[in-house]
Swiss-Prot record:
Protein name, per record: Phosphopantetheine adenylyltransferase
Source organism: Thermoanaerobacter pseudethanolicus (strain ATCC 33223 / 39E)
HAMAP family: PPAT_bact (MF_00151)
Keyword field contains Nucleus: no
EC number: 2.7.7.3
Amino acid sequence: MKTAIYPGSFDPVTYGHIDIIERGANLFDKLIVAVLLNPSKKPLFSVEERVELLKAVTYDISNVEIDYFDGLLVDYAKKVKANAIIKGLRMVSDFEYEFQMALINKKLNPSLETIFLMTNAKYGYLSSSVVKEIAQFGGCLSEFVPDIVAQKLMEKFSR
């Protein structure tokens, strides 16, 4: 069975992430969307909230699992018996960092491949940070995130 991991913070999940999830799920028998616990970051949503939002927006993709991890991605990949890592690339600026990470991961685990998927052009500008900024100022989110995510964002910023 070919298994891939799509790691990220997903704070929050956007239509750009969902596009990569759908396309990645078509390439592998199983796709694990793995929320990274990064102690140096202060996310808007807890890991539990991010996992629940991801489950809500991927419930209809049968070969997608949602999980979370901390530590090294290569260690997590070994634990879940993943063959590959999927990374979405929006712009050339994403490539330099992601390529460096792919080389490091390959050095740490030579059997683990990184697959780069170019984002759909309509999501090339989209990031979780931009979505949070729009939400903070009460802007319309319908082009960027599913309704459930927009609702949760508005709840966070109305407190």
